[in-house]
């Protein structure tokens, strides 16, 4: 697992706005987790998906996801886990979508530690998130741009 550093702040997402995190993974991997606050709301549901990156946010989302999971009643600061068959090193999009039932967010890092790009409604924004990744082989560099 890769552990990030920096000051973390919970950031609330806007309901109905898909959130994307594009990252270059430096080794094969088979799961990731996001620690996601709900500010005490107990009925939050969301869909967590992984896509192989394809040119831009919209084109990527038109393709079938590598893996997807509907999460019901996500606990406050619970770890949203997505497991899948081993994927090769490369560029991917993590998508948080279809969330409802209360507030939902993620822990934003004070410094860019993963060379990630964040998308809100398809628009690229600067942000870095607390993400744990399970690599199946030891990476020389966990993440690349």
Regions found by a protein language model. Name each.
Residues 1-62, 73-145:
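Beta-sheet-rich sandwich/jelly-roll-like modules and their strand-loop junctions
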């Amino acid at each position: 697992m890769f552990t990030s550093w920096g000051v973390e702040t919970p950031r609330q997402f806007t309901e109905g706005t898909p959130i994307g995190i594009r990252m270059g993974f430096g080794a094969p991997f088979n799961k990731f987790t996001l620690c996601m606050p709900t500010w005490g709301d107990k009925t939050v549901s969301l869909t967590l998906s992984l896509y192989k990156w394809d040119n831009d946010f919209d084109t990527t989302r038109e393709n079938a996801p590598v893996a997807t999971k509907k999460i019901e009643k996500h606990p406050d600061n619970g770890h949203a886990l997505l497991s899948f068959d081993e994927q090769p090193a490369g560029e991917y999009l993590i998508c948080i979508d279809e969330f409802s039932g209360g507030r939902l967010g993620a822990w934003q890092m004070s410094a860019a530690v993963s060379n990630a790009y964040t998308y809100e409604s398809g628009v690229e924004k600067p942000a870095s998130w607390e993400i744990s990744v399970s690599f199946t082989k030891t990476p020389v560099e966990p993440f690349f741009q």
